[in-house]
Amino acid sequence: MKKISRICGALLISMLLSSILSGVVLVIMGTLNLPLDVQSIKVICGSIASVGYFYFFRFFTKEIEKIDINEISLNKKFSVWDGIGYLLVLLGGTTILSGITDIILEFIKRYLFHTENVGVVENYIGNVPAWILLVCVVIISPVFEELLFRKVLLEELLPYGKVTAILISSMLFGMFHANLEQFLYTIFMGIVCANIVLITGKVRYAIYLHMAFNLFGAIISGYIPSGRYTILTESIFVISAAIIVILKAKTEFIIKDEANVNKFNFKKEFCGIGFIMFMVYWIISCVGAIAY
């Protein structure tokens, strides 16, 4: 079986098993009469599912050829200022990509589905207590998502070269979220985090960045007044990101590959049954998220 097909098949099966696991936990928690609303329980179960994704996927792909990140990373030091710079790039890029996505979704929902453009993320975390978001969304999910996509999966793709591994792992990370609202900016996040891992050789820095991003998006942003303050904040992010990328793109991002890498046949790899099934799942999930 082709490697991408096998990886996508493993992702799909892992997501299915993790959904069953979180569903069982959801039912159990629902019968215990806990002082939590349904949405809070769903967020908790979502974090449990992210743990399951990692362990199931690692089990199903343990025999796939891989290259250890530490063997080919640049092993550069990573300072607090580097982290702040990457976070600004991530927030600035996300601001732009989210704006583009909102325009697309507004058109699709209004003219094709005749529904209001209510955010998937807003529905998911809205009215959930901050402590639950902190534990589940800011701590647990980033740890296991980064271990899955920027450690296990990235190493399995590295035989094709760093650039190919970054792009494909990031695309699968975007599809993993199974909705159009998060698709573009999660791909961008994947690219940024994968670059950090391959430059430093340390997954923990990508985890810290992911945590900081989720902390801002899930908790801190809720305390920023809407209107001109939001526009000012987003403008600062975009301008800062543009300046950092212009000044440091060549040293802080991997933009070319080594010569001695395995040839990647896009046509053959993306025509495998595993990738096709994963794509079908993603399309159905996106349509469902838009329609409902």
Give a label for each model feature.
Residues 1-3:
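Short, Lys/Arg-rich, polar N-terminal cytosolic tail immediately upstream
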Residues 29, 33-41, 70-144, 155-158, ...:
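Juxtamembrane helix-loop-helix connectors linking adjacent transmembrane helices
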Residues 6-20, 84-94, 273-282:
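Alpha-helical transmembrane segments
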Residues 17-29, 52-60, 93-108, 196-200, ...:
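Alpha-helical membrane-inserting segments
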Residues 44-91, 95, 103-112, 243-263:
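Membrane-helix interface linkers and caps
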Residues 130-291:
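Transmembrane helix-loop-helix hairpins at the membrane interface
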Residues 10-14, 18, 41-49, 54, ...:
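Alpha-helical transmembrane segments of multi-pass integral membrane proteins
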Residues 18-64, 231-239:
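Alpha-helical transmembrane segments in multi-pass membrane proteins
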